């Protein structure tokens, strides 16, 4: 598809495939977050993290959506240092749902609410909950 070719050319520095197998939304979100937050993205299939903030060295996991739920990894060993959850708007802009540490989200919502996981793989988080938590993130923990 031409749109895929265009995305690959425009964002070639990030080396994303923009494939139509369910990763398209994630790839788009990652490159938009990389530009907005000054991230260097890791190659595909890197566990836990999608990239690192160049100016601070903070490692981040990015979850992207088009107004749907976001997923947070299950397991203490999979909690990312920093977690970005974004909605990609129709005009290509990002709505930041959550920008903070993974530990803050985990302790202040998942543990506090005794949230149920899906088959020990992830927790499902609504955009509304993410926005509420985002308002509580300490300023020093924002990318």
Predicted regions and their residues:
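Nucleic-acid endonuclease domains
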Residues: 1-143
């Amino acid at each position: 598809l031409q749109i895929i070719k265009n995305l690959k050319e425009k964002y070639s520095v990030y080396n994303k495939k923009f494939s139509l197998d369910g990763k398209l939304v994630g790839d788009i979100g990652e490159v938009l977050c990389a530009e907005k937050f000054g991230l260097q993205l890791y190659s595909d299939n890197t566990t836990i993290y999608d990239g690192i903030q160049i100016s601070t060295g903070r490692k981040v996991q990015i979850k992207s959506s088009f107004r749907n739920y976001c997923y947070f990894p299950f397991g203490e060993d999979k909690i990312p240092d920093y977690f970005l959850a974004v909605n990609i708007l129709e005009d290509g802009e990002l709505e930041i749902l959550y920008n903070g540490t993974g530990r803050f989200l985990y302790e202040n919502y998942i543990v506090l609410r005794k949230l149920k996981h899906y088959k020990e793989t992830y927790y499902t988080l609504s955009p509304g909950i993410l926005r509420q938590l985002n308002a509580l993130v300490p300023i020093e923990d924002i990318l």
